[in-house]
Amino acid sequence: MASKAGKNTPIPLIIGAGGINPAGRVSGHHAYRRLVIDSLSREKQERTYLSLAKLMNREKTESINESDRQYIRNHTLIRKIEAFDTSKVLWQTPLSFLASDSEQNEFNLTKKNIPDSLRSRLNIPDSESDVLRVKTQEQIDVLLPEYRESKVTSAGQLPSGFDPGSLYASRSHPRALQMTIYAASDAIRSTGFSIDQLRNMVPPDQIAVYSGSAMGQLDEESYGGLLQNALIGKRPSSKHCALGLPEMAGDFVNAYVLGSVGETAGIIGACATF
């Protein structure tokens, strides 16, 4: 900022840092300390372990034992995927049922589950029973669920036991939004101000939020649900579309957490991003 005398005057900045990643909580340099924990003093190691123990819902006393320390080391950073069994990943295998020259295919179906597209191709008995024995001479193509071993078995994951959605009313919120809510709270608190104090100091149209995922939200509460629900017997909804937008996390924090009317923007990726 230039003064009337033409000299540059430094602008005071109050900067906060917050968030959550596989190493833990960003504020207070806790996540960084987890990365270099073997090089820290005993006192700083203990503070880092205690911070992670509380985050992972393992804090019992003001100190932790060696078993707790080993658990924390094994369940932070990059490690074997814990969210699902990597040796048993659901897969769909296409199959075709072919009738022989002399016999028809026979199988049981419940009335409500007979697809409309197959009714004209099936010999459906006239019965009041809920389960019908149907026959057909035509080829029937189906997808048979089976399991395969994942080619990816390790990844960076949030510390085991940490659930950002349990910290607020997060019903139907995608995982990325839950993490953004936590990150925004962590960052604001690290400045030493509360949200109410910031609102009193800064006009709502001068608060900007820039946040988002390059790929948008992809879990079952967002684009994942929008794209897969119709294929697995569930109902997709317009809510999945709105919650999947890349900028949605930033917009949500801006509108519902801060009550701001300032600028928002998402972080959109491209091939060159890598």
Predicted segments with their positions:
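Conserved "HGTGT" condensation-loop signature of ketosynthase/thiolase-family condensing enzymes
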Residues: 1-215, 219-262
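Short, structured patches in soluble enzyme cores that scaffold and shape functional sites
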Residues: 213, 269-271
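Short pre-catalytic strand/loop immediately N-terminal to key active-site residues, enriched for Gly-Thr
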Residues: 262-269
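Short conserved active-site loop signatures built around small residues
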Residues: 274
